[in-house]
A protein has these predicted regions:
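Iron-associated oxidoreductase/ferritin-like identity signal
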Residues: 1-97
Length: 97
């Protein structure tokens, strides 16, 4: 799995590839944190703690959005796909018959 590290010898990977790996792994971690906080918010019975957990979850969403934007700016194909699918009213699976 990507979160376990590199799949190819690191000395054969360019600096941009290593940076992209860092960003992708970080994005995965942020999304995992959102999932964990969602579960904690659902399971929590203390309203004060629930509010803190929801706040923390939303900060993780901000981090994920920042990483996704960095990836978009660095990867032309991601840029193309995100511009096609995000913030659109088109069917999500458009273009796939």
């Amino acid at each position: 799995m990507a979160h376990e590290g590199y799949h190819e010898p690191i000395d054969q990977l360019s600096a941009p590839t290593r940076d992209m790996h860092r960003a992708i792994v970080s994005l995965m971690e942020e999304l995992e944190a959102v999932d964990w906080y969602n579960q904690r918010v659902d399971a929590c019975h203390d309203s004060g703690l629930k509010e803190i957990l929801a706040h923390n979850r939303d900060e993780e969403k901000e981090h994920a959005a920042m990483l996704l934007e960095w990836i978009r700016r660095k990867d032309p194909k991601f840029d193309e796909e995100l511009k096609d699918y995000l913030f659109s009213d088109k069917p999500i699976a458009h273009g796939h018959d």
